[in-house]
Amino acid sequence: MDTPDQLSLRRYGASPGSHSHDHFQILLGLSGALELEVEGRGVRVATGGGCVIAPGDRHDFESAGGSLCLVLDSAHPGWAQCASSQLTTALPTDALPLAHYLASALQQGRPLAQTHGPALLLEAWLAGSTPHTSLHRSTRQRTID
């Protein structure tokens, strides 16, 4: 993918047929449910769910009742850490409100959402998949006198 990461809002309905991409495709469910087949495995992205499709994975989709997804097309190698054999997951805690904000910002034409949104989504997704470290035990903290 020669172009920069691209965020978009997409409404899904009937299937256009099986296809693949040369980049990661990240789907974040905002409303409805999207049924996918990725490399022969069934995947469902419902509201609050997400899916990372790896480059080259053949996939097809359908949404009988319609669905709205925030979609990121990205060649960033960091998404490889998020792609898994499970494919679909509940969005990490910080990713869902971020996805809603980015969707609103895209609709309102806020350019910084397109510029910085892809990196923020990756950061939020990765943060949700790694153990959290407590800030309360920092060596820099001391009691207040």
What does each model-found stretch correspond to?
Residues 66-68, 76-116:
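General nucleic-acid-binding
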Residues 92-99, 103, 113-145:
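A short, Lys/Arg-enriched amphipathic alpha-helix from helix-turn-helix/homeodomain DNA-binding modules
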